[in-house]
Amino acid sequence: MKVTTVKELDEKLKVIKEAQKKFSCYSQEMVDEIFRNAAMAAIDARIELAKAAVLETGMGLVEDKVIKNHFAGEYIYNKYKDEKTCGIIERNEPYGITKIAEPIGVVAAIIPVTNPTSTTIFKSLISLKTRNGIFFSPHPRAKKSTILAAKTILDAAVKSGAPENIIGWIDEPSIELTQYLMQKADITLATGGPSLVKSAYSSGKPAIGVGPGNTPVIIDESAHIKMAVSSIILSKTYDNGVICASEQSVIVLKSIYNKVKDEFQERGAYIIKKNELDKVREVIFKDGSVNPKIVGQSAYTIAAMAGIKVPKTTRILIGEVTSLGEEEPFAHEKLSPVLAMYEADNFDDALKKAVTLINLGGLGHTSGIYADEIKARDKIDRFSSAMKTVRTFVNIPTSQGASGDLYNFRIPPSFTLGCGFWGGNSVSENVGPKHLLNIKTVAERRENMLWFRVPHKVYFKFGCLQFALKDLKDLKKKRAFIVTDSDPYNLNYVDSIIKILEHLDIDFKVFNKVGREADLKTIKKATEEMSSFMPDTIIALGGTPEMSSAKLMWVLYEHPEVKFEDLAIKFMDIRKRIYTFPKLGKKAMLVAITTSAGSGSEVTPFALVTDNNTGNKYMLADYEMTPNMAIVDAELMMKMPKGLTAYSGIDALVNSIEAYTSVYASEYTNGLALEAIRLIFKYLPEAYKNGRTNEKAREKMAHASTMAGMASANAFLGLCHSMAIKLSSEHNIPSGIANALLIEEVIKFNAVDNPVKQAPCPQYKYPNTIFRYARIADYIKLGGNTDEEKVDLLINKIHELKKALNIPTSIKDAGVLEENFYSSLDRISELALDDQCTGANPRFPLTSEIKEMYINCFKKQP
């Protein structure tokens, strides 16, 4: 079927599409056999095709076109023979990723007059390798040779089992038919002039185009001159210069200019005389672009066209010019063995000239430099950086270099050279089979790796302090910096530690000015003292403020260059955070000795710090801040005030509940959280009433607090903590009370099976928070027949516990004035949404929902 009209093109396209549909079901083995035999056929016909191309177009050299045809068959086959292009091409079981290659459909292949047969071979082979059909639109001046090449490949492919009509062509090409083909095919491979490529991109279908070349090459004074000149002549004379990547201008440094010029003449170049330049200019450039009559002609022929007598053996014509402007014909792409030569005062001047020439024409295409790769590395790097070209060659003939797999074997062989966004293309490399494939990615569900990280050593038991601290001697520690506040200091706890340190022959310094909250100003002051003392051990003694302070002091002591603002940057996933905490432990270790049963900070990576300038509280979190050693000695908790016992105990309860229902909860944290909850409900009331005398209750609460800390350190906390931190910061309420005021309302909010918003990436398969709250109720034996009943019983149990501990019922009862509450409501609601803890909550809240919960907690009646 001949194609000479739109109707015939439609009919042929339909036939090719049917063939491609069959071809798309072929296996990799079948495709590879077809690919191999088609390449063999191209190689067998290389001389016949080369002769046909030169005879028809009058361009280039038969001998070089033979090489190009051979290259298009052999090198393309060798490069891609083992590449997977059919079906599953990649399978990663651990990551649950499968990649599947599918053909695009029918490729519209636009063929240039300069390289008709080799380009046809290339595009046919990469289309067959990818199970695509291909429909050629030859250049009118190269239609016979293009069709001959296409038919050669088609016959071999069909003989090897490919569907008939998998390759087609336009017999009488025209602009109308070419444009129509580009509109109807699935993708266009456009190799040709700027107007044709622009038309392909405007067709309404995907297109891979090329761009014009205008390759500048610098010869540096460090270059091997003979190699540089020989390489440029090799490239420039290849097929009479029709390769778009061939050198168009050579820029030579002044210090070696005459040597280079002499070498060119020695190698057969003709240096155009000054009085001959205008004659050549008139011949090589017509109507603002290269004269088609010189394309692919020999240097001798072009000289004759200009009326200049040169030896028949002349290899290239060189015009010594100075202008870099658009008006200078030598400054443009010439597609023939005609070369411009510029003299540069120095390398900087050469670089400027090269940049100007690329901007004049050839953006994105190719550039080159000849320089010593060792001695002139800085110049090569500067050239590479300055050139807006996707191919920059060093000591390589650019025609051969751009073709690929020659002189550098990581450049893929190709006859369609993408020029990137600089050149108006979407491809910034040599085009190959991968550009003719749809890659489907099948992603199977995988869960993120979880972890369980706690201090290296956790010592516990009533009276264990003196035995645990003996480890410091074994670790050869010599200087300890104690961080505490006035309460434990006055209670002689510090004296107890000092006696142990003195017995161990460890020098010490005490900082006892930590306030009710860990604040940045105090921390920085303490860090200065710490830096002067230069300890190898930091001992945190106290509760959350002391632990938080010591953790941040540790960071600032070991890394004074860090900024608090960076440490406070929030993250969605602790493993993917933008700011990475520095490694700790090179200067000192951190020993955390808790004197209260509350947050469990002695085993967590958390630090709650207040910025004195803004009054805002920040929850810092990073496992680098996890203490190296934790000591949980209930003897240090016997004298805790009743109020602190109540607030810190409820804090531990909320930690446990939120860790158990967190989106990061795991089998490793669940057991700790549940047992901590049981212990708290059982022993907190007794510790509150008779804590100074009930050793068992104190010790059980100490265990519960630390277990809750371990659970929350690895499962993280939730919305109750987000809201409590902001409420505490704004209205000066202790964080334990703030958590107590909010927890019941948060449980009600979370306890739904159809939340308005789910957490972004939970570990659970579906919302099951009601079930999890019910399991807590079951674990502490509250009864109830349904999960909903059990949730209500849990809320009631918490309410009863708070009542027994004399904790306020509402925010209002906690002393917050109504006017102050409502004036801050919008702000703290928004801040709570953005808090670090919110992301781990099982139900993701809206700001309006947070606001509503705050209001409910403010108005709540006893």
From Swiss-Prot:
Domain of life: Bacteria
InterPro entries: AAD_C (IPR034789), ADH_Fe/GldA (IPR001670), ADH_Fe_C (IPR056798), ADH_Fe_CS (IPR018211), Ald_DH/histidinol_DH (IPR016161), Ald_DH_C (IPR016163), Ald_DH_N (IPR016162), Aldehyde_DH_dom (IPR015590)
SUPFAM superfamilies for this protein: ALDH-like, Dehydroquinate synthase-like
Stimuli inducing this protein: Induced during switch to solvent production.
Enzyme type, top EC level: oxidoreductase
Gene3D superfamilies: 3.40.50.1970, Aldehyde Dehydrogenase, Chain A, domain 1, Aldehyde Dehydrogenase, Chain A, domain 2, Dehydroquinate synthase-like - alpha domain
Alphabetical keyword list: Multifunctional enzyme, NAD, Oxidoreductase, Plasmid
Reaction(s) this enzyme catalyzes, per UniProt: a primary alcohol + NAD(+) = an aldehyde + NADH + H(+); a secondary alcohol + NAD(+) = a ketone + NADH + H(+); an aldehyde + NAD(+) + H2O = a carboxylate + NADH + 2 H(+)
A GO cellular component annotation in the UniProt record: cytosol
Residues that hold NAD(+) according to the record: 420-425
Example GO biological process: carbon utilization
Entry annotation: catalytic residues: 244
Listed EC numbers: 1.1.1.1, 1.2.1.3
Molecular function as annotated in GO: acetaldehyde dehydrogenase (acetylating) activity; alcohol dehydrogenase (NAD+) activity; alcohol dehydrogenase (NADP+) activity; aldehyde dehydrogenase (NAD+) activity; butanol dehydrogenase (NAD+) activity; metal ion binding; methylglyoxal reductase (NADPH) (acetol producing) activity
PROSITE patterns, per the entry: ADH_IRON_1 (PS00913)
Family: In the N-terminal section; belongs to the aldehyde dehydrogenase family. In the C-terminal section; belongs to the iron-containing alcohol dehydrogenase family.
Described function: Has both aldehyde and alcohol dehydrogenase activities. Can use acetaldehyde, butyraldehyde, butanol and ethanol.
Name of the featured protein: Aldehyde-alcohol dehydrogenase
Species of origin: Clostridium acetobutylicum (strain ATCC 824 / DSM 792 / JCM 1419 / IAM 19013 / LMG 5710 / NBRC 13948 / NRRL B-527 / VKM B-1787 / 2291 / W)
